[in-house]
């Protein structure tokens, strides 16, 4: 494993972790969600599956999260997450492990980011696996209680306890919500002609199953899969859920990495 810091387009540091395969069968970039970090269990388990299949795995902390990169979580936006993904891939293109087409995986805000990348650069990507992805700002808005949204707007920020980092309170500016409204995966879903694997928890209230079914329906062809993990929430942590996700990935990678 090799961990380094690179600069993004704003001259901020991004922490990148590269796990090289000795006999590389493929390359995958794995991306966390809002307020996440590259070592979260649901990312570790996906990385394990790809490594077992001979892939070089690249993970990174976006800026404005709780990892090792620059910035503050309260300033996080989908725009900044997506730009960091582009910048990590651009940097990787100068490295000896780089190959195209590569694979992409992302969770939640990372999920919409990797699909946006595919929609913008379909020829560079062999397959994409959004886990519990945000589908659009519009659908996200429908998911909010109008009273909570009004309170967030009036106050300028909202706070909640972190699920992954005990004792950490996450404060997020209202600008994140406004920025998210600019994005929607559905109009360009026709570009998703490569294998697409969508995974979502049955009890996900942030990016619920009904949102994933809308995205799934918009994707053309027959190289698409939607897996619903029973009893699972938005962020996966239970061992049985993690193992199920790993098994799904192992089968999917085997099916399409030829």
Task: Describe the role of every protein-language-model region.
Residues 1-23:
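N-terminal cap/lid segment of alpha/beta-hydrolase-fold proteins
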Residues 41-70:
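Conserved alpha/beta-hydrolase
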Residues 43, 194, 208-217:
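Short alpha-helix in the alpha/beta-hydrolase fold that links the catalytic acid
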Residues 75-96:
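Alpha/beta-hydrolase active-site loop
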Residues 120-170:
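Hydrolase active-site cap/lid region
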Residues 192-193, 198-200, 204:
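Short beta-strand/loop motif that positions the catalytic acidic residue
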Residues 203-207, 235:
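Acidic catalytic loop of the alpha/beta-hydrolase fold
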Residues 232-245:
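Catalytic histidine-centered segment of alpha/beta-hydrolase-like enzymes
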